[in-house]
């Protein structure tokens, strides 16, 4: 893999999920990689072990003699010392998605897009290809248990990429096959309204070449609305009977989901995946559809999906000893994702009391979707809401916005037992009291609530009878 005369790549914010994946791919492809991040983490440590030079904090000195600087949408480029230093030296400065698009030119790209399900679907396709004897190159915005990381550099012709719609990043990619797994309003700091988001997804779909194909989940109304605007070959999937590839007879038992797949109205196979919930049926159908397009045998597709071990932070069971409580860590941060996670917990563990622990992510998202979060959480037996994880936003810019908006919305939606607990220590103590047999604690959010989930699992292990 070559990028002209580029040998050294500097990555600003190298510890982020998407940026660390690029760093891994570049390292495994023989490039020299340097980078910076504000704090040390397990991710930055792993990159250092692989040969990356990682600096803590941002400084003009960090860029050294690199050939290009790559930064993510989470970095305020106009305020970053490293970006400014590179521009002053005449070093090219590009966003993550542009680098991804360049790396894709060497492979047949399978790009997985959608408001929800991108990470899991990308990992399912990768696992399926590996099981079929292919050797794909893979980049996922999360940690795959099967890949033991977020990337894989293979020798085969396929490159499987998670395509992010935030900041219109996916429009820089060069897919041969494109998946649109879901679509609804999200990223209000990028898209003014749903029409702007629709336009971006149509543009993404139409980037596929004439010989490629776009796979659309028709269970989503917004996906159905944009299909007539696509001018590429299409393939539909879903639980809707009109789909080319349809799932029926869905059973959810604990962490396992089983369903029958019909292809063009004919029964094709019975499928089992180690991922609970109807939303994961959509993810698996997307993988099956791409597998059929690539000419993989049905038996190979089914066995490949059966070997899928799951994703970190995607309904990840951190503790589940028989006779004890169940602790689940989930990345859900959009109302539909929260609703799907709660439904999966209800369906898979019908005898358990479901305690939904939710940390809102971003003030802008909390403001836009507070009522929707309330409805999504209302199906839980008990709701505990933490304060907002600010991430790239500043608290001062959003006066009066807190997790209490979500807690109040949950009460209005009919939830019976709701608590807003902004203090972390108090939240941890409260949740430890719920770690008893018969309870399932579902910790959700894109922020540091994952640390709380791990602490609760440790608490359960230490207090085993």
Curated annotation (Swiss-Prot):
Binding site for ATP: 114-120
GO cellular-component term (any): cytoplasm
Any Pfam family matching the protein: Mur_ligase
Domain of life where this protein originates: Bacteria
Biological process (GO), any one: cell division
InterPro entries to which the protein is assigned, alphabetical: Mur-like_cat_sf, Mur_ligase_C, Mur_ligase_C_dom_sf, Mur_ligase_cen, Mur_ligase_N, MurCDEF_pg_biosynth, UDP-N-AcMur_Ala_ligase_MurC
Record's subcellular location: Cytoplasm
Keywords per UniProt: ATP-binding, Cell cycle, Cell division, Cell shape, Cell wall biogenesis/degradation, Cytoplasm, Ligase, Nucleotide-binding, Peptidoglycan synthesis
Catalytic reaction(s) noted: UDP-N-acetyl-alpha-D-muramate + L-alanine + ATP = UDP-N-acetyl-alpha-D-muramoyl-L-alanine + ADP + phosphate + H(+)
Matching Gene3D superfamilies: Mur ligase, C-terminal domain, Mur-like, catalytic domain, NAD(P)-binding Rossmann-like Domain
Pathway(s) served: Cell wall biogenesis; peptidoglycan biosynthesis
Enzyme class: ligase
EC number: 6.3.2.8
GO MF term set: ATP binding; UDP-N-acetylmuramate-L-alanine ligase activity
Family statement drawn from the similarity comment of this UniProt entry: Belongs to the MurCDEF family.
Protein's job: Cell wall formation.
NCBIfam families: murC
Protein name per Swiss-Prot or TrEMBL: UDP-N-acetylmuramate--L-alanine ligase
């Amino acid at each position: 893999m070559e990028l002209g005369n580029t040998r050294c790549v500097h990555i600003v914010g190298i510890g982020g999920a998407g940026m660390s994946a690029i760093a891994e791919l570049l390292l495994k492809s023989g490039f020299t990689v340097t980078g910076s991040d504000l704090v040390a983490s397990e991710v930055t440590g792993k990159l250092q072990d692989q040969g990356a030079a990682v600096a803590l904090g941002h400084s003009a000195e960090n860029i050294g003699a690199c050939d290009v600087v790559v930064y993510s949408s989470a970095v305020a480029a106009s305020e970053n010392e490293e970006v400014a230093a590179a521009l002053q030296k005449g070093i090219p400065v590009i966003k993550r998605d542009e680098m991804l698009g360049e790396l894709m030119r060497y492979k047949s790209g399978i790009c997985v897009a959608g408001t929800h399900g991108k990470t899991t679907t990308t990992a399912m396709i990768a696992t399926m290809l590996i099981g079929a004897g292919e050797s794909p190159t893979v980049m996922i915005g999360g940690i795959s248990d099967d890949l033991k990381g977020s990337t894989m550099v293979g020798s085969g012709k396929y490159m499987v990429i998670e395509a992010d719609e935030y900041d219109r990043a996916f429009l820089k990619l060069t897919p041969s096959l494109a998946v649109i797994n879901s679509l609804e309003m999200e990223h209000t700091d990028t898209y003014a309204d749903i029409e702007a988001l629709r336009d971006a997804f149509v543009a993404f779909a139409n980037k596929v070449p004439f010989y490629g194909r776009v796979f659309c989940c028709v269970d989503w109304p917004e996906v159905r609305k944009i299909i007539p605007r696509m001018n590429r070959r299409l393939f539909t999937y879903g639980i809707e009977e009109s789909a080319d590839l349809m799932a029926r007879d869905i059973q959810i038992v604990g962490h396992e989901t089983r369903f029958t797949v019909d292809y063009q109205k004919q029964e094709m196979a019975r499928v089992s995946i180690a991922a609970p919930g109807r939303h994961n049926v959509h993810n698996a159908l997307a993988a099956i559809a791409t597998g059929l397009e690539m000419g993989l045998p049905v038996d190979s597709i089914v066995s490949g999906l059966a070997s899928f071990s799951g994703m970190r932070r995607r309904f990840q069971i951190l503790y589940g000893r028989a006779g004890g409580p169940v602790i689940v860590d989930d990345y859900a941060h959009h109302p539909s994702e929260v609703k799907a996670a709660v439904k999966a917990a209800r369906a898979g563990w019908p005898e358990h009391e479901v305690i939904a622990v939710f940390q809102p992510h971003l003030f802008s998202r909390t403001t836009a979707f507070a009522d929707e979060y309330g409805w999504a959480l209302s199906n839980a037996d008990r709701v505990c809401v933490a304060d907002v994880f600010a991430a790239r936003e500043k608290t001062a810019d959003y006066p009066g916005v807190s997790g209490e908006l979500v807690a109040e919305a949950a009460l209005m939606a009919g939830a019976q037992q709701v608590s807003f607990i902004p203090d972390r220590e108090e939240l941890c103590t409260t949740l430890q009291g719920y770690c008893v047999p018969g309870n399932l604690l579902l910790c959700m959010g894109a922020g540091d609530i994952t640390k709380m989930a791990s602490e609760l699992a440790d608490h359960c292990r230490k207090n085993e009878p």
